[in-house]
Amino acid sequence: MSRFFVSGYDSESSSEEEDLLTSSEEELMSSEQESDSEFDDEFANDDDSDSSDSDSDGRPSGPAYFLKSSFRKGAGGDSDSDSEDEGRRVVKSAKEKLTDDMKDAVEAVNSAKRQENWISALTEFERLGRLLVRAGQQGFGTPNFYIKCLVDLEAYLIETTANEKESTRKMNANLARAFTSLKQRVKKQVKEFSHLVELYKSEPELFDKEEPVETIEKDAEIQATPLASSTGRALSPVFATLKSVAETRGKKNIDKFEQVQILEDLLEEVSPKGSPFEIISIYQMLLSIRFDASSHHAFMPLDQWQKNKDTLNDLLDFLEKHSNEYQVSELGTASDDIDLEPPANADGIRILPGSVTSHIERLDDEFIRYLQNTDPHSLEYIDRLKDEKDTYNLVVRGQLYVEKTTPDHVRGTYQGEQLARIVMRRMNHIYYKPDQLIKANESEAWRHLSGDSQIVAKNSEPKDVINGLAEFLSKQDGAIYPKGALLFSVYYHAVNNDYSVARDMFLSSQVHQGINNADSSIQVLYNRAMVQLGLSAFRYGNIEESHQALNEIANSQRLKELLGQGFNSKYPSQATVAEKQRLLPFHMHINLELLECVFMTCSLLIEIPQLAAASNSTKESRRKTNIKSFKSKLEFHDRQYFTGPPESIKDHIVHASISLQKGDWHNAYKLLSTIKIWKLLPNNDQLLEMMRGKLQVEGLRTYIFTYKSIYTKLSVVKLAKIFDINEEEVLSIVDKMISSGEVSASLSDDKKSINFVSSEHLQRTRLQELAIVMNEKIGLLTDKNEKTASNGHGRKTTQQQQQQQQKEQREQTHDENIKFRYANVNTNNDEFQTIA
């Protein structure tokens, strides 16, 4: 029966029931069973003759029969029996219940000890330990009888061990293992409660009481006595607190936020009158503990990040104020005694061990992780991105301080790496931005800073800032800093329309040769720089170089992974922590639709004339350029029965290519210019004007390739009118085509017409081309039949010659193609493979 019906329901009693354990619950249930059995007996003894008298006897009927008598109508006469039931109930608190359980466990341990049943003793002692943990969690303290049990058990185990050594009779293996485990656990508990154990041995009468021994006075005496250092010296209260926090750092079941609060209170108390050494030590410990508190989260909470940023600024303020006395540097020597100040150097400055660079790097990493875990299309991301200004200001300020604390003779070496790391961090914040944003960031960063930098002067132009930082990094030890400086510079110049400088830096450095053995972050930066170089070449009008730079990476199936912008081959939930941290925040991404649009436009301008030339030439004179990528898109479009108006970027470019094949450059330009993504590029009008000129030129070339087998003469004036370009430019284009051997023609004496002449390779009709293809296939079929007839040993001369020719062609083009080959980042195991 439910307890709700037994004792009634009350909101207050129900809430108290959560904290109380009723020791007479079994009695209550037994009383219910007795009453229920009485009802059952009465029910069993009833017969049909008594049923008519049930109402007159006052016995319940129907559902009311199963209610307790206290709930029946007219049950007030049973008040005496109810009061007797209430008198038998004993309600104990959770503390009393837990104490009884612990006493039972102690008795079980003592009983097993007397019987030398060490397996049972170990089991009961472990149960007693779990109960003790519960008592500590609920704030009940350590019972006195537990300390008694612990001391007695320790003494008995020592005595048993001594007797066991003297005795010839040994324990069996199971008892011996249990006995050894029990000794270890008892020893650990004695060490943990050493102060209570010592107190019990000295004053056992204090433990005769039921309540735990009041150790407040003892604790106060212990706290009043300063802690000792490793050399036996007494620690001050400040360093005693710091040492206690440091000793518990990293351990389980430690409330890190409580440690943060302790350090914050300590800093507030010590700041007005404490020594600089104490205050600096508190600042460094507080920053580290705050970072530890959020180490198990995906990112640091915003309020904690803001507090750490303010604390780091306060630390730099304090260090700058006492720069003639104390410095924090990675060059400082650590000591086991946290309260000992290091000796002063020749300048009278004490170098404290620490790292301003590491604190700034960690703060910046937490900022990036917050952005990575925020929806980039939300207002929260935009609001959070505003904090980048504060982060960059802190990076510049930290660089100035590290410059002052890093001697000149260690710069460029491994010992001075702290300066190189923070300069690298500064470059990482500005290399992808246009000059206007860099200038705004620099002016804001230097507004509240005094002094100047030896690496980059104050109020320098954006170009000088990038060049100065890159020059400093290029002189550092290790491969990551020179390569990073070079790729940062290439990316910056490419973004800011300085294509020629970016291209010369990229090619002259030969950075592509060892990129597959570089760090993953450098590989991602390399791919980003190469893509930005291709986009810059397109804006500059170098279509072929842009196509060459973007060709491999745009056709890759792992485009997002190569650029550090996501995953193509796996779900984000399947990625490791290292792979996720390698990703860039959204505001640093390269627009992949823009990349695809630029690459396909370059393919259109290059491959459409090649397709026209190949369709009207002999096989021997066709160009070796691979034109399958764009040709497959056109063939797929031609196989469609119904094609609607263009919608996507790809549709616009395919329709534009079809128009260009027909010589309709104007319609091709109209289709390309309606693509809205061009507005993302700077100088949009100049870009469209450049595309217009390229379409006119390539349209003219396509027209000549298409109709050279039909016409014997073409008018220069007519061509100039069709393609809306002047006659001099038409003559220049045709002259280049003639001199390069693309067409067999000549210009008339008056330069007014183009005369096509028959070449040594006769122009063939479509039927002739199909006949030649059929002849080649028949030859291959004949070779296959001969090979089958001779048990697989047919003629191989032709095949070997073809393979040799293909090998020579690959060797010739390998050196040229590898210049713009992307770094293949292997995200599965963070190893890097070279593309074959």
Swiss-Prot record:
GO cellular component, as recorded: cytoplasmic stress granule; eukaryotic 43S preinitiation complex; eukaryotic 48S preinitiation complex; eukaryotic translation initiation factor 3 complex, eIF3e; eukaryotic translation initiation factor 3 complex, eIF3m; multi-eIF complex; proteasome regulatory particle, lid subcomplex
One GO term of the biological process aspect: formation of cytoplasmic translation initiation complex
Function statement: Component of the eukaryotic translation initiation factor 3 (eIF-3) complex, which is involved in protein synthesis of a specialized repertoire of mRNAs and, together with other initiation factors, stimulates binding of mRNA and methionyl-tRNAi to the 40S ribosome. The eIF-3 complex specifically targets and initiates translation of a subset of mRNAs involved in cell proliferation.
Primary location class: cytoplasm
Identification of the protein by name: Eukaryotic translation initiation factor 3 subunit C
GO molecular-function terms, A-Z: RNA binding; translation initiation factor activity; translation initiation factor binding
Biased composition (Acidic residues): 13-55
Domain PCI: 586-761
Compositional bias segments (type: Basic and acidic residues): 86-97, 807-817
